Amino acid sequence: MAARWSSENVVVEFRDSQATAMSVDCLGQHAVLSGRRFLYIVNLDAPFEGHRKISRQSKWDIGAVQWNPHDSFAHYFAASSNQRVDLYKWKDGSGEVGTTLQGHTRVISDLDWAVFEPDLLVTSSVDTYIYIWDIKDTRKPTVALSAVAGASQVKWNKKNANCLATSHDGDVRIWDKRKPSTAVEYLAAHLSKIHGLDWHPDSEHILATSSQDNSVKFWDYRQPRKYLNILPCQVPVWKARYTPFSNGLVTVMVPQLRRENSLLLWNVFDLNTPVHTFVGHDDVVLEFQWRKQKEGSKDYQLVTWSRDQTLRMWRVDSQMQRLCANDILDGVDEFIESISLLPEPEKTLHTEDTDHQHTASHGEEEALKEDPPRNLLEERKSDQLGLPQTLQQEFSLINVQIRNVNVEMDAADRSCTVSVHCSNHRVKMLVKFPAQYPNNAAPSFQFINPTTITSTMKAKLLKILKDTALQKVKRGQSCLEPCLRQLVSCLESFVNQEDSASSNPFALPNSVTPPLPTFARVTTAYGSYQDANIPFPRTSGARFCGAGYLVYFTRPMTMHRAVSPTEPTPRSLSALSAYHTGLIAPMKIRTEAPGNLRLYSGSPTRSEKEQVSISSFYYKERKSRRWKSKREGSDSGNRQIKAAGKVIIQDIACLLPVHKSLGELYILNVNDIQETCQKNAASALLVGRKDLVQVWSLATVATDLCLGPKSDPDLETPWARHPFGRQLLESLLAHYCRLRDVQTLAMLCSVFEAQSRPQGLPNPFGPFPNRSSNLVVSHSRYPSFTSSGSCSSMSDPGLNTGGWNIAGREAEHLSSPWGESSPEELRFGSLTYSDPRERERDQHDKNKRLLDPANTQQFDDFKKCYGEILYRWGLREKRAEVLKFVSCPPDPHKGIEFGVYCSHCRSEVRGTQCAICKGFTFQCAICHVAVRGSSNFCLTCGHGGHTSHMMEWFRTQEVCPTGCGCHCLLESTF
């Protein structure tokens, strides 16, 4: 907690108000407290002299209330109740409802008056709509914004009349009211619900969000993927709002927790400890707002409303305001802000008055943010594992190319010389790295000849470079690349200021555009060390998908290579940083010293007007000849050339061994296997697969009923042991395995699976008894097929038939009589069968099957893979028919279950009655009657009984009713 704290200056109690919302008018004269029955208007200049009431008839509480922020409309305020908004007018000591806004279909969550237009009011609701109303015409909203999720907060930008922000669970959307169809920018701000949202009072791009995830984050919506800073808290944050002075922030914790009733004042430049704590409320703070500063006074007043039904006004004097100020080297800070990030046109909302003030001649530079608190450093170490840890690594990893910069690096001497040429100015600087660098040890910067800039500019550059280096090394990060960027950016900004001053000597400095707020930032270069391990983007690629299509993309035909074919491809995405902005161009590195390291400089230089893309790193637009047309001024060479190639989807079904038409024509009739094989042969003939016609013809003969095996193993050798039996079928399966024809494999396995089943016998877990599943050999003689559904699973060269050995299989069977079993089967059989005749019958059941039961698992994989292909084809009924023949039982349950032992025979019981002794499983420890209904038991001693008896016993007792001495309430929960 902060060392400084204070109690309130003014306390006013409203015991009967039951107000849930509060607002202070823009003049600082009145506050409105919104209850269910009355609205209380409090005179803040004389809060003890009574208050006025406005009666309201509603069963709904007021969710949000706000005065109009414009002086000419200061007597209007809006209050939301359920699905409507009432507009009140307070004048001459009396108030009345002026009009009502109705349009939402769900509860209104928030409202906000426009900062620049007094007639506009925005409302948000959980019905996913955000409405902008004009109070001059309240029949319907003038603008409707729609989102997927409901909005909990809505706030107008304090510097841009067209910009507003809304929060949706943990996300923030930035809107332009002129483009209501879609949001301008999206921020994935928090992992939990956002409770508070507030724009910076001096910058149109910066906002703060407070969330249920115990944090307040600061954002520049031009950089939606990276927050500027974070304020970690111990509990969820209800509201976080900027102060009207300096760089302060006030936070309040979530009301539902009832832990912290104080308000905390923070300096956004130092978020480690609050600079002030407002202590006094006995219950959670529901709302707080700032009162307008009185004329001639430097003090501010903070007005708060709490659930303890007290209104308190806190005085914030100039001394407290200075705690939030950052007055160190104001001139340098103003200079830093003058070279701040220039907005991207597609992400920045400009007003008509300021459009001409923004230029993009120098691209953009990443915005700076403040160092995070120390307790976050440990959490971010994992993000820095890819960063260089030594100077040698830093020199070798730098892959950034900056225009007009020469760098000579000497890792042995731990130094480098940087030369920058900008306009008529030249800067040469010596950078020396201490031995502890980059572990909280910053390098030193020294200007050397020839350097042509002024002493004032040298001081400013040194200040900026030292600050940038310190911010990096505090977190153990390398700083050479960020310092190079800052050096060039500052120097070019200084030169531009000189040029603009000389071209317009009558222009007033900063007469139109105020400087951006002094908000701390840290340079995070795009495509820098963080991307050193990310492969360089592709300009072409191809991918197979499971439905028989090939998706690929290539470079446009209008482009050709910009570099020679021998030029090495960049190794990582960090090389693309040279093309991210117009400010950056190839860096030329001198390598006079033999031991120096040379940076990558093989990319082509591009002009300022060329568009930046991944393709432009490899290719450049072909120079097209221009022909004059008959029409004057037309030029065929000026036509637009596409900067990206097309994405093409190609049907490659003709190259695959599976056919969708066969999938539609194939049948599986388990009642007539002969008819199934004959019709499938006819279907194969229709699509021109003569090889499959022969296969299905052989299958028709092999499934003839006259070849059916006898039940007695002593009568004859089963047909499956014949060379044209199982051996022929296995050779067919091996052949189509080599062809990756999973369609034929699955259909053959399904047909012969159905042929081996006894008529009328259901098969939930396989064609053989469950106990024989222990005898299935784990290895497979077929290639591995998975049910991924991708064509790559059938065309992967890694799928081979090396495990399929017909000769070895035959030798194995010829070495012993057909009725004998292998030693492995005998070993398992001796454990499973007590009667040798039973084992012999079971072995006969396996030998008479055309499909080897040892490969059942692989046959199931064929069917699952083919079923996945049928699903992608949209043949779901065919898929269901095939999957009916999957014979493997479901995986056994591996979770935790509570079992019961019978109190009589000590057998495991799954119900209330024992299946062995037929007695009831357990008795109540109190009434000694069998328990059949609701029961509770101690997990330590195992005693228990009827729930009602146990509850009544433990109302007055602490030990087990059986007298075992167990303290059941402490050991387990009843």
Curated annotation (Swiss-Prot):
What terms describe the molecular function in GO for this protein?
A: signaling adaptor activity; zinc ion binding
Placement of WD repeats on the sequence: 57-98, 103-143, 146-185, 189-229, 232-276, 278-318, 319-362, 668-706
- Kindly list the GO CC terms recorded for this protein: cytosol; GATOR2 complex; intracellular membrane-bounded organelle; lysosomal membrane; Seh1-associated complex; vacuolar membrane
Q: Name one GO biological process term.
A: cellular response to amino acid starvation
The entry marks the following residues as binding Zn(2+) 1, namely C902, C905, C914, C917
PROSITE patterns, alphabetized? RWD, WD_REPEATS_1, WD_REPEATS_2, WD_REPEATS_REGION
Where are stretches of biased composition, namely Basic and acidic residues? 835-851
Q: Which residues bind Zn(2+) 2?
A: C927, H946, H949
InterPro entries to which the protein is assigned, alphabetical: RWD_dom, UBQ-conjugating_enzyme/RWD, WD40/YVTN_repeat-like_dom_sf, WD40_repeat_CS, WD40_repeat_dom_sf, WD40_rpt, WDR59-like, WDR59_mRING-H2-C3H3C2
Question: SMART domains this protein is in?
Answer: RWD, WD40
Subcellular localization: Lysosome membrane
- Which Pfam families does the record match to this protein? WD40, zf-RING_16
Q: Which PANTHER family match?
A: GATOR COMPLEX PROTEIN WDR59 (PTHR46170:SF1)
The record's note on quaternary structure and interaction partners says: Component of the GATOR2 subcomplex, composed of MIOS, SEC13, SEH1L, WDR24 and WDR59. The GATOR2 complex interacts with CASTOR1 and CASTOR2; the interaction is negatively regulated by arginine. The GATOR2 complex interacts with SESN1, SESN2 and SESN3; the interaction is negatively regulated by amino acids. Interacts with DDB1-CUL4A/B E3 ligase complexes.
Q: What does this protein do?
A: As a component of the GATOR2 complex, functions as an activator of the amino acid-sensing branch of the mTORC1 signaling pathway. The GATOR2 complex indirectly activates mTORC1 through the inhibition of the GATOR1 subcomplex. GATOR2 probably acts as an E3 ubiquitin-protein ligase toward GATOR1. In the presence of abundant amino acids, the GATOR2 complex mediates ubiquitination of the NPRL2 core component of the GATOR1 complex, leading to GATOR1 inactivation. In the absence of amino acids, GATOR2 is inhibited, activating the GATOR1 complex.
- The name this protein carries in UniProt is GATOR2 complex protein WDR59
Q: Which organism is it from?
A: Homo sapiens (Human)
Organism placement in taxonomy? Eukaryota, Metazoa, Chordata, Craniata, Vertebrata
